[in-house]
Amino acid sequence: MMVVVLALAGAMSTQVSAQVLRDAAFNSIGRINGNGVVRDGTMHSIGSFDADGKVRDAKGNAIGVIKELEIFDTEGTRIGYINTDGTVHDGESNILGYISINDGKVTDAEKKTIGFARGVRVDWIACYYFFHFFGK
């Protein structure tokens, strides 16, 4: 299981350069670089992902943690997780949406396109689009 989890988490992160985050109309709305720094559409830093799984806001405060495709708040409560097929669930196992491993398309539970994020780790995509860690 650990190998599958690590393979999926890394499946969309083979490049070190910044990857563009896009809305449903394919407009650029931000970037995530290979070091985990998240930037908004005006290139201001709005947070980051640490190597140890911590998710931080623009001021460096911990706002969550990622552990093996599970997402936790700062109190340790699981608020969501991602299946190996890219399905994103909330903490109560309700489907929030989907992340296409093939093309980076992000859709909501009704399969309506909400964005695109190719070349970005799937757990980082979920934190940005579904768990709104960066006010998005």
Model-derived features: positions:
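Long terminal segments
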Residues: 3-40, 44-45, 51-53, 61-62, ...
